[in-house]
Design a protein with these regions (language model features):
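Hydrophobic alpha-helical segments within soluble ligand-binding/sensing domains
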Residues: 90, 143-170, 214-218, 267-270, ...
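Hinge/cleft segment of the Venus flytrap/periplasmic-binding protein
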Residues: 40, 175-179, 183, 198, ...
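Flexible loop/hinge segments that line or gate small-molecule binding clefts
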Residues: 109-149, 267-275, 279-280, 327-329
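Hydrophobic alpha-helical
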Residues: 95, 99-127, 191, 210-273
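Extracytoplasmic "Venus flytrap"
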Residues: 43-62, 66, 70, 77-91, ...
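Short, low-complexity disordered leader/linker segments with a strong preference
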Residues: 1-43, 68, 121-125, 333-335
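Short, solvent-exposed amphipathic alpha-helices that sit
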Residues: 55-70, 74, 150-157, 182-202, ...
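Structural recognition of the beta-strand scaffold that forms the well-ordered cores
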Residues: 44-48, 56, 77-78, 105-109, ...
């Protein structure tokens, strides 16, 4: 019997009861191996925010690792637009796949959560969000990092590092991502709370939006140095690429010699920069696990398991003390 027929039989009643937004209660796990033999694998659409960066390649590597380990359970169709501002292209990809009858479920990392929520409003197939939440009663689960909490942990670590570096006035300016993006907002909220709770001051009026790109982060950092010629204790960024760009831009400015540059993601290039003393720290996501666990959770629910509200893939604060260990681990994932 095809697995999609199994899905229809098992989920006809349970989906109606469990489609309670991405905030439903955690429920017992199903057996991830059930129904694997003698039936076709589930067809799952997985749409990334982009497929042009290391961060998303690691997520894809994790997803493909699960697929490779369980070829009888799932077959993936993974795609993504060229950049994290390619909104229309991603929406078109999602719309196309929603209209494709062969897919049994959809894993989506939305660039625009509200727009995607509207797109999935009429689907009767399982939808799960990864990396960024989709606020919709059709979204069964969120798989990823608690962005606010991870940023908060990183911010508190940055304040302690700034104190150790000799800063008395601990102010923080953020070089932010895309204004209005849910992930960017969550990270900013976490940075603000972490800095302020640890005794620093998050300068809300000085936030610089850089659309999650290194080029605009350079421009933002140049503006910060012009406005704050005596230096700033902490520069936090929405992602590692921007943090590396900001640190590089300030490298020859003696007023910023002891500035703590905090990134987010913990990607390989950032870990190498931290190990080499070119970046101070990063609030690292376990992005390989995001991909792996997203597919794992989708398969479990397609087999009749109750969806979990949140599958937390964890956070790691990367500093010079543990950067090399993470480099070795991540390099292995990309082989």
């Amino acid at each position: 019997m095809k697995k999609k027929n199994l899905l229809a039989a098992l989920l006809a009643g349970s989906l109606a009861l469990s489609l309670t937004a991405c905030s439903s209660d955690t429920a017992p796990e199903g057996d991830p191996q059930a129904g694997g033999e003698g039936s076709d694998p589930f067809q799952v659409s997985m749409i990334l925010k982009t497929n042009s960066s290391e961060f998303w390649r690691l997520i894809q590597a994790g997803a493909e690792a699960y697929e490779k380990e369980h070829p009888d359970l799932v077959k993936l169709s993974i795609k993504g637009p060229p950049s994290e501002t390619s909104y229309e292209e991603q929406l078109n990809m999602i719309q196309t796949d929603l209209g494709t009858a062969e897919f049994d479920g959809y894993l989506i990392a939305p660039l625009q959560s509200d727009a995607v929520a509207n797109q999935i409003a009429n689907t009767d197939k399982p939808v799960m969000a990864f990396d960024t939440r989709i606020e919709s009663d059709k979204c069964l689960s969120f798989i990823g990092t608690g962005n606010k909490e991870a940023a908060k942990q990183g911010a508190k670590a940055a304040v302690e590092a700034a104190k150790a570096a000799g800063w008395e006035k601990i102010q923080c300016i953020e070089i932010a991502g895309v204004q209005g993006d849910a992930t960017n907002t969550a990270r900013m909220d976490g940075y603000r709370e972490g800095i302020n709770e640890a005794g620093g001051e998050f300068l809300d009026n000085e936030v610089q939006y850089a659309n999650a790109t290194a080029d605009l982060a350079v421009t933002a950092m140049e503006g910060i140095m012009g406005k704050f010629p005596d230096g700033v204790a902490i520069i936090c960024s929405n992602n590692d690429d921007m943090a590396i760009a900001a640190a590089s831009t300030a490298k020859k400015n003696p007023a910023y010699a002891n500035t703590i540059f905090l990134g987010f993601d913990g990607q390989l290039s950032a870990c190498e920069a931290i190990a080499n003393g070119e970046l101070t720290m990063s609030a690292a996501q376990n992005n390989y696990d995001i991909g792996y666990k997203a597919v794992e959770e989708m398969v479990r629910v397609l087999q009749g398991g109750e969806p979990k509200d949140f599958v937390d893939t964890g956070t790691e604060i990367v500093t010079k003390d543990n950067a090399n260990e993470r480099i070795e681990r991540m390099s292995g994932y990309l082989k």
